[in-house]
Amino acid sequence: PYSMSYSLSIQRELPWGIFGEIAYVGNQGRHLLRQPDINQATFDALVANAALPTAQRSSVNALRPYKGYAAIRMRLSDSTSNYNALQVYAAKRRGGLTFTTSYTWSKALADTSGNGDNLEDPFNRRFNYGPVSFDRRHIFVTTYTYRLPFFRKSKGLLYNALGGWEASGITRWQTGQLLTPTGNTSIGTRRADYVGGEVNVAGADRFVQWFNTAAFVSAPDTRRGT
């Protein structure tokens, strides 16, 4: 495996002692590791046996390429990934108020997300290409320190006891992890079918139900979920 990283940035001194930077950052990963199950029943086998009774069709071992064996994991190095981001950074390190602030707008895509994932179709890497599990589209982080003005001009014991105090904090906001609804089937984890309707749940219910489950149903055995 190897990766290629590149970036282009512009830095500038701004008014009020603020330093600013805006950058494009990219990364390409090639020959990444994955461990697909090469003995998983293919969709072609499922389609070819669609006319069989359900009891026979649900016996996944009878549909495996290598009969008599369960999962066979093969380590391959044929996966790819790419990352593209706009990064904005600002810092002020002088005066009573100092801070550093950064914002990242990014997207990370790959056809694998760890060499042990259980992909729905290990024979079709293009179908598995999409956002990785650690993808966060928006990340905002700021750290700040404010030097309290109380007793700043005092001297001696009064200043040592009550002066020189600072208030500081760290704030971070980021978008959540993307979610792909899946379900367990006879051939492993499968994507669900989107049947329409609003996915997001508004109001207080969103803390109990993260998304509208009625918008998804199990996909048929003979094709991939949407």
Identify the function of each model-found stretch:
Residues 1-226:
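Short, solvent-exposed micro-motifs at the edges of structured domains
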